């Protein structure tokens, strides 16, 4: 714990918290200080100009990151018949119906995301108290309740991330790993920013993209100068 504290102090000494850094400079700082022995994730926080307490200003959706996330995503699918076969062909790790539901109820959940065909929601709906708190309950707003389960599986495997404003109106997402090139991380961040911009609520007033910050798994955040994000 002492080593972590020392590293964080050294990082904070290099970063001016009142300053917004050009993307390349911010990323260089973050990578320099991401000295953990594992391949740390690169995370982004985006402060949106919304009132998250109002249901019509909750920003929620998903986006496929062009360079992926660097994570091997395990996908479970609720489907039957032809759709089940399509899900398997697309790379789903687990496909089932009542059997999958019973496995989940028993606490057996070796997967990261759950996708469901609309006609299976009578079964999936009984799992809300289990999947909901884990952020895995299928929802049409993020594309995990869909008749096209094959495409949903492919998107999940390709590096799709889901996003939703927290109570403070902030979006948190992982855009890659320390080992990614700067270009890959920037392309992923731009894809997320583009998706958030398109998802702007009609009732949102004033500046929408208020603040963008990057950090590594074990590091502090660095604010980004948004004018340096132009593709």
Swiss-Prot record:
InterPro entries: Ribosom_uL1_bac-type (IPR005878), Ribosomal_uL1 (IPR002143), Ribosomal_uL1-like (IPR023674), Ribosomal_uL1/biogenesis (IPR028364), Ribosomal_uL1_3-a/b-sand (IPR016095), Ribosomal_uL1_CS (IPR023673). Pfam families: Ribosomal_L1 (PF00687). Keywords: Repressor, Ribonucleoprotein, Ribosomal protein, RNA-binding, rRNA-binding, Translation regulation, tRNA-binding. GO terms for molecular function: rRNA binding; structural constituent of ribosome; tRNA binding. The keyword Transmembrane does not apply. One of its GO terms (biological process) is regulation of translation. One of its GO terms (cellular component) is cytosolic large ribosomal subunit. Part of the 50S ribosomal subunit. Binds directly to 23S rRNA. The L1 stalk is quite mobile in the ribosome, and is involved in E site tRNA release. Protein L1 is also a translational repressor protein, it controls the translation of the L11 operon by binding to its mRNA. Belongs to the universal ribosomal protein uL1 family. This is Large ribosomal subunit protein uL1. It comes from Herminiimonas arsenicoxydans. The lineage of its organism: Bacteria, Pseudomonadati, Pseudomonadota, Betaproteobacteria, Burkholderiales. The gene is rplA.
């Amino acid at each position: 714990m002492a080593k972590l504290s020392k590293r964080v102090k050294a990082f904070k000494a290099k970063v001016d918290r009142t300053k917004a850094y050009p993307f390349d400079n911010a990323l260089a700082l973050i990578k320099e200080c991401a000295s953990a022995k594992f391949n740390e994730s690169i995370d982004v926080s985006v402060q949106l100009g919304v009132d998250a307490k109002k249901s019509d200003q909750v920003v929620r959706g998903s986006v496929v990151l062009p360079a992926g996330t660097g994570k091997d995503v395990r996908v479970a699918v609720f489907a039957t018949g032809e759709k089940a076969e399509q899900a398997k062909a697309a790379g789903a790790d687990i496909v089932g119906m009542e059997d999958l539901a019973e496995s989940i109820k028993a606490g057996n959940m070796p997967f990261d995301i759950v996708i469901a065909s609309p006609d299976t929601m009578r079964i999936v709906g009984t799992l809300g108290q289990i999947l909901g708190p884990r952020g895995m309950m299928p929802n049409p707003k993020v594309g995990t309740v869909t008749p096209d389960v094959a495409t949903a599986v492919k998107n999940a495997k390709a590096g799709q991330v889901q996003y939703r404003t927290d109570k403070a109106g902030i979006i948190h997402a992982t855009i890659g790993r320390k080992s990614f090139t700067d270009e890959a991380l920037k392309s992923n961040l731009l894809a997320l920013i583009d998706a958030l911009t398109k998802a702007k609520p009609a009732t949102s007033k004033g500046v929408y993209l208020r603040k963008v910050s990057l950090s590594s798994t074990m590091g502090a955040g660095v604010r980004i100068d948004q004018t340096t994000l132009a593709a």
